[in-house]
């Protein structure tokens, strides 16, 4: 970070403080609004269809957890702004890890909102957009890394796969819990869901962990990104073939695209620098 011009460091620090204040003050209110509307729609849906009975409980747990996590990383973003402005190397990976959370969490809350409410603009989307602007701002202000296009592509795909991993993991869990034949794995569909859901959740953790590690040019980050992306691809492609649900295809396609990108030698060399061997 010390090779980065002071002006860029100061701008990045200001961006972190602004995003952190938003996450700590405005985001909880916006996410509460999204939670209320989504829960209301899910309760009505569950009353009409018992197979959706798990939806309200899963949302009532996952949405507040995302809201709390976004609040905490907002405070963390403010805390690391000063050492980042002074050029501490550890702060840039930490900043990306923090700013990925509102982008991922906001989108993870937006997708159920759009699917269940759908007639108004999702308040959680504002959180996603603010997170993305700050995330890309921090990426683009790092002018001392060169070839920023590769960074933007890879770190965007990591965020997309992480988001889909959470959504698919939670959705698979909900569908599995709602089946009256559980815990028996009767039929190909429920058996596929019992695998793809947990694999997607684990893949989410791996691809998220890859963000700060790759920002620090750690080889472990490349491996975590590759393992997470190939796992979500391998688990969700058969589930799509069996269920014909498009969101499993989205997960498989995003995983394949990330894995293929990471395997390009020029991309790997760019991400890891001297740590390619």
Locations of regions flagged by a protein language model:
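Topology signature of small-to-medium multi-pass alpha-helical membrane proteins
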Residues: 1-277
């Amino acid at each position: 970070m010390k090779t980065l011009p002071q002006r860029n460091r100061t701008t990045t620090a200001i961006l972190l403080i602004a995003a952190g204040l938003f996450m700590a003050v405005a985001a909880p209110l916006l996410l509460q609004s999204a939670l209320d509307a989504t829960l209301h729609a899910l309760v009505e849906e569950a009353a009409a269809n018992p197979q959706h009975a798990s939806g309200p409980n899963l949302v009532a747990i996952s949405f507040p957890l995302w809201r709390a996590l976004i609040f905490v990383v907002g405070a963390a973003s403010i805390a690391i702004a000063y050492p980042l402005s002074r050029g501490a190397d550890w702060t840039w990976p930490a900043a990306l890890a923090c700013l990925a959370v509102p982008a991922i969490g906001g989108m993870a809350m937006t997708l159920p909102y759009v699917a269940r409410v759908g007639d108004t603009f999702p308040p959680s989307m504002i959180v996603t957009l603010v997170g993305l602007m700050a995330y890309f701002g921090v990426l683009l202000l790092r002018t001392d890394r060169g070839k920023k296009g590769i960074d933007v592509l890879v770190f965007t795909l990591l965020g997309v796969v992480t988001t889909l991993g959470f959504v698919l993991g939670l959705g698979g869990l909900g569908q599995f819990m709602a089946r009256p034949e559980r815990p028996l794995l009767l039929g190909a569909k429920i058996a596929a869901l019992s695998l793809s859901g947990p694999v997607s959740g684990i893949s989410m953790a791996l691809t998220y962990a890859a963000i700060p590690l790759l920002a620090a040019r750690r080889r472990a980050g490349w491996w975590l990104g590759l393992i997470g992306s190939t796992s979500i691809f391998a688990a969700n492609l058969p589930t799509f073939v069996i269920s014909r649900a498009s969101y499993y295809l989205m997960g498989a396609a995003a995983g394949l695209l990330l894995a293929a990108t990471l395997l390009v030698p020029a991309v790997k060399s760019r991400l890891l620098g001297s740590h390619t061997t």
